[in-house]
Amino acid sequence: MSSHEHVFAVFDISSSSVAGAHVLSRTDTCPNALILTSVRIDAVVTDDINIQRFITQANRSLEQVISTIRAQDVHKPSQIQISLASPWYSTETRIISYRSEKPFICTKKLVESLVDTEIADIKKTDGPFGSYGKDSVIIEKQLSGIKLNGYLTHEPYDKKATELECTLTVTIAPKTVLDLFSDTLRRSYGARPIRFTTGAFTAFIVARDRLPIE
């Protein structure tokens, strides 16, 4: 395999199914991705709703998906990415406000400091997952809007204001579930970097990058 080629293992875990694929990525061609093999296994539907059984079944489906795609493709992925769908994560939106009687300069450092403080506060609270466990992990964070003196702006830095408002969106997942999925992947693929993402943030990034800013 050339230095321009990399193989990734990609998984999609939702409430209704688990899917997986080995994807060959090339940096010297367009299109630059080729699906080498893929499979999807539907979840087992039962009338008896039991959280622990639900988690166990999802992990068992993940094991089956891994076994199938590894049997169909001999490549050894260098990285692993998992996209989580509901109910495996929760989305929270926080409004961060900063005010001063005297005008101040809005800087990237100031915004990052406010975001870091808010993230630290989120980490101190119990996760919203009930039976999934209290410990949670922040998967993604994104500033979805910044207002100066009440007006939304796409270029806030180096401008004077007396009021700053940031809209912060984070996705959170139960640590016990992430650890379970990660352990299953490492048993099959070894010590590969594992990255978790969510369907919500994937859609946001695609929309942000494709739609014009007005």
Can you say where each PLM-predicted feature lies in the sequence?
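Nucleotide/phosphate-binding catalytic cleft detector across ATP-hydrolyzing
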Residues: M1-S17, A21-Q79, L84-E214
